[in-house]
């Protein structure tokens, strides 16, 4: 879920955060609908319908339709008891599907029918998108549509950095526009308490402010809060009136707001105000778990949840349940007594005891508990719903056990990750999740039986905010990736197509920017690499997120200009070494974005035998196993791409080239991703041998990367030489303590 929060503040890349709309003028065929999410069925007809100068609708028509048409068309919109045959809205229970609607535009006018009020509201958003695209002259068509999943959510963490309520209101407006219907509000965590408790006022007085907006400085050094009103204090909390405003606005839009109160872990901010709720009975840097042995803890939890339920009518209440350190429970007399009394064998069962007890309380108030997938550990509460973030395994297990699940895997829908290569991007929380990767996600695992698939309620995108300091940056990370989430949770899998979606989303970007949303402007170049061992070559295929952009490239490492070769779709073939540099241009002018650099080598080591002398790879990061470091495949900017091999021990391998070979250059690339405990090797050494017994060192290289570097770093350890050998041995030292990784993608031999 949170994925290792050891982080450092960096200055934002302002040109990118501005989201310049001047570069988003892609022209598609005039007959292509640009609707997001894509409807289940669209039947086009010849002709069009022109909106009358005065729009008349029935008095009970949705207010969102009246307001939206007036804003988009500038026309006068009036209401009457009878309405007009030219613009009719109806409730028709015969319409099939969850939140189903039917939109008919003919020469006679517009008829919008919904299965219920929710379906009618979804149809309103579709009609307004059509008006936004076509103006007052709408194409004749019939759209029949309904939702694939009931739960289509977005989570925003406001604990690590406080986000004002007006930003939340804007986000809700955009969510409704794209048929997203659940807003998960992560209100409290170790970064600060944002919920206004009347019974426990010290929570906002003593745990809502700190003296720095630098997350690493706060989290790694002292984790100290300051009192409200301290000069220079950073933070904030919501008033009860602000929460009511958000909930009421969301309700009008058809969105449910789900509050989250973290427990029993991620609770160190609570102890700044009420230290007696910890096992030690005092604030402590390493204390982040509530004491489950004390009855006082449960009184506190029930009191807070009662106040939460007063303000939030949501059926679901999220209680967190993730990443409890459990480092004090085993030695805490109160927790040990609880375990003995309840017959609990370990700390996992102790946490499960708390979750079950909290669930029973919520159920008694007519609510349901939802938690992160760690609540599976130690036994799942009877009626709990699981939010699966550590991959899909937890969600699969819960669904197979008959529990409802919301899929939110970090691999695809964590929006705190970089969305393009990190150069020139504002700092992100490690990882690499492009728009395409998010769009590719299918929330229904194939391993589930049909009877189990019904327990997958939907999916959710999460934005954790360690490095997201303000609302503009939050919008930059959310948009347009939540549009991909909207389509993957609403549209049938059979109608989804990423190239088609990409063309449509490029039309929505300038609209988002015109509405004041600071959306990421989609300017990435992707490189697809394929190794063909039969032809002894590597092919490189390029694609851009901007369909209207031109890609110019070179293969000698020089910077492309408009006179450089333009990529036209045919793969670039590499039979030895290529230093590819590619850049985006628009109408002959370079875009203000760093070029991408990519190296491909069909080298002498590809396919040769490799032996791991002491330690093999970590089972979580095998890449291609024993073939990974000699397969010609280079890793992407994320350690999660399956192309980087990870070890928690020193890397020591021997490569057999099959015969004594002329050697001119050997190099290996390593990654540092400090946030994820991945560090550069302190030293890399190359040794050579003709017989596999007697080795000679041809050089050692020490890393040039500081362990304090917070951004992803890629360093190549290079060994030029004029040698002959059959065996090549590479040793890379892991200087860090147990549990820290070294990651490498390829050993290149020339």
Q: Where are the regions that the model predicts?
A:
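Active-site neighborhood of glycoside hydrolase catalytic domains
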Residues: 270, 280-281, 285-382, 389-397
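Bacterial N-terminal signal peptides that target proteins for export
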Residues: 2-11
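Flexible, acidic glycine-rich loops studded with aromatic residues
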Residues: 369-374, 379-384, 390-539
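Feature activates predominantly on carbohydrate-active enzymes
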Residues: 32, 95-316, 357, 361, ...
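Bacterial N-terminal signal peptides
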Residues: 10-19
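Aromatic, loop-rich ligand-recognition surfaces of beta-strand-rich domains
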Residues: 635-699, 711-750
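Short, compositionally stereotyped local motifs that mark structural "simplifiers"
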Residues: 4, 27, 492, 496, ...
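Acidic, contiguous N-terminal accessory segments
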Residues: 26-152, 365, 369-372, 376, ...
């Amino acid at each position: 879920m949170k994925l290792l929060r050891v982080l450092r503040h960096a200055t934002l890349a302002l040109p990118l955060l501005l989201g310049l709309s001047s570069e988003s003028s892609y022209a598609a065929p005039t007959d292509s609908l640009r609707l997001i999410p894509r409807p289940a069925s669209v039947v086009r007809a010849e002709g069009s319908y022109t909106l009358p100068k005065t729009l008349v609708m029935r008095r009970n028509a949705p207010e969102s339709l009246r307001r939206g048409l007036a804003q988009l068309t500038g026309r006068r919109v009036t209401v009457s008891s009878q309405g007009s045959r030219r613009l009719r809205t109806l409730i028709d229970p015969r319409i099939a599907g969850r939140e189903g609607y039917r939109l008919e535009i003919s020469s006679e006018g517009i008829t919008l029918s919904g299965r219920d009020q929710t379906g009618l509201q979804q149809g309103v958003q579709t009609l307004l998108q059509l008006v936004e695209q076509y103006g007052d002259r709408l194409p004749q068509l019939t759209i029949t549509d309904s939702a694939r999943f009931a739960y289509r959510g977005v989570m925003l963490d406001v604990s690590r950095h406080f986000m004002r309520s007006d930003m939340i209101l804007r986000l809700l407006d955009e969510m409704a526009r794209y048929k997203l219907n659940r807003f998960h509000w992560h209100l409290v965590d170790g970064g600060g308490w944002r919920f206004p408790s009347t019974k426990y006022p010290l929570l906002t007085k003593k745990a809502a402010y700190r003296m720095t907006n630098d997350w690493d400085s706060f989290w790694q050094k002292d984790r100290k809060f300051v009192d409200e009103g301290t000069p220079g204090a950073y933070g904030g909390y919501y008033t009860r009136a602000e929460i009511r405003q958000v909930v009421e606005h969301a309700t009008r839009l058809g969105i449910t707001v789900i509050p989250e109160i973290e427990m029993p872990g991620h609770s160190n901010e609570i102890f700044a105000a009420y230290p007696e709720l910890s096992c030690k009975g005092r604030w402590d840097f390493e204390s982040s778990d509530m004491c489950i042995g004390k009855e006082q803890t449960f009184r506190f939890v029930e009191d807070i949840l009662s106040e939460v339920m007063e303000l939030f009518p949501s059926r679901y209440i999220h209680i967190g349940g993730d990443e409890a350190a459990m480092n004090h429970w085993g030695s805490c007399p109160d927790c040990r007594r609880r375990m003995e009394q309840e017959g609990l064998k370990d700390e996992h069962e102790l946490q499960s005891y708390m979750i079950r007890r909290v669930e029973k309380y919520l159920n008694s108030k007519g609510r349901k508990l939802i938690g992160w997938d760690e609540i599976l550990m130690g036994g799942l509460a009877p009626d709990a719903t699981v939010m699966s973030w550590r991959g899909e395994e937890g969600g699969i297990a819960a669904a197979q056990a008959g529990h409802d699940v919301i899929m939110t895997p970090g691999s695809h829908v964590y929006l705190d990750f970089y969305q393009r290569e990190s150069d020139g991007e504002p700092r992100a929380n490690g990882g690499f999740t492009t728009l395409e990767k998010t769009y590719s996600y299918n929330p229904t695992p194939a391993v589930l039986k049909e009877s189990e698939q019904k327990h997958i309620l939907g999916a959710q995108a999460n934005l954790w905010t360690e490095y997201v300091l303000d609302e503009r940056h939050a919008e930059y990370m959310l948009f347009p990736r939540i549009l991909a989430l909207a389509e993957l949770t609403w549209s049938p899998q059979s109608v989804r197509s990423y190239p088609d979606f990409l063309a449509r989303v490029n039309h929505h970007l300038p609209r988002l920017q015109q509405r004041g949303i600071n959306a990421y402007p989609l300017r990435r170049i992707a490189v697809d690499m394929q190794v063909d061992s039969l032809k002894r070559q590597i092919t490189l295929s390029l694609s851009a997120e901007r369909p209207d952009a031109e890609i110019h490239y070179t293969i000698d490492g020089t910077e492309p200009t408009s006179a450089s070769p333009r990529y036209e779709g045919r793969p670039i073939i590499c039979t030895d070494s290529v230093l590819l540099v590619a850049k985006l241009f628009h109408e002959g002018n370079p875009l203000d974005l760093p070029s991408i650099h990519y190296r491909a080598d069909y080298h002498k080591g590809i396919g040769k035998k490799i032996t791991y002398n002491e330690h093999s790879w970590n089972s979580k990061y095998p890449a291609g196993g024993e073939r990974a470091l000699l397969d010609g495949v280079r890793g992407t900017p994320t350690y999660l791409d399956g192309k980087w091999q990870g070890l928690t021990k020193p890397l020591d391998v021997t490569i057999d080239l099959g015969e004594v070979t002329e050697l001119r250059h050997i190099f290996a690339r390593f990654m540092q991703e400090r946030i994820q405990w991945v560090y550069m090797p302190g030293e890399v050494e190359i040794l050579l041998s003709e017989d596999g017994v007697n080795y000679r060192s041809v050089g050692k290289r020490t890393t040039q990367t500081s362990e304090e570097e917070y951004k992803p770093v890629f360093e190549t350890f290079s060994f030029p030489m004029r040698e002959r050998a059959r065996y090549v041995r590479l040793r890379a030292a892991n200087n860090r303590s147990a549990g820290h990784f070294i990651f490498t993608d390829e050993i290149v031999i020339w």
